[in-house]
Amino acid sequence: MRNTDKRWDMIFMSHTLEHIVNPCDFVRKCEKMNTRYFFIEVPTFDYKLSNEPFGMFCEEHVNMFTLESLQNLMNECGYQLVSADFNINVTSKLPAGSPAMKTIWEKPFKKKYQFINNSKNILCEYINDSENLLAEVRKRIAEIDEKKKLAIWGTGHHVSMLLANTDLLDKNIVKVYDSDRRKYGQKLNGCEIGAFSENDIIQGNVQAILLATYTAQDALEKILETYQNKVEVIKLY
């Protein structure tokens, strides 16, 4: 962080702290430039949807916070909590950024407020629910006929998780689709990544399509409605 003699009444930090390797050291450096208030917005682990893919909250994040853990951090750095609001959008399907909490902190630290929630219990419950969901996903993939010509639609970190934790590699993968043109020409499991082509279905080159994405699953399913009698569409969630 650049040295400066300037000081601000409020520091505003939105969806930043989860990317910082040493958040305590970072906040302490910010504190030297701050006279009173600190606004922090981060994804929260206090509320997680257990029907999300296992661990998909971790996209480029090196830290995950509950209000309890964030309070411990900010108290250590000389701040006390003024207010906290939780934004829970159950239809967003963006595990990496939602739900989120918006908090305001004030210095100097005077009193710590004790919350009933327990971060360890929340984490254990999340792991238990997610392992149950992953077992269902494994079962669905195991049921895919190994003789069928399978296309995978989606090449993000979610499909990497599937390749590592299921027997997807044992299937007859012949095509890989993605909507991101920047990935075209690259390979996944020996197949070149490209755009979806209806000719693959019409010509019989693809017999089943696995929707290997959580955030875009509904949108892709709608695209494939036209071909529902010609190709098997496999959803995981």
What is each stretch, according to the model?
Residues 1-55, 59-79, 105, 177-184, ...:
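Conserved SAM-binding loop
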Residues 88-93, 104:
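N-terminal juxtadomain amphipathic helix
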Residues 78-80, 231-232:
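Charged, glycine-enriched surface loops/patches
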Residues 79-90:
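Conserved S-adenosyl-L-methionine
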Residues 39-41, 83, 151-152, 235:
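A structural signal for short, well-ordered beta-strand segments and their strand-loop junctions
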Residues 47-48, 91, 160:
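Generic structural signal for helix capping and beta-alpha/helix-loop junctions
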Residues 97-237:
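Hydrophobic, well-ordered beta-alpha structural blocks that scaffold small-molecule cofactor pockets
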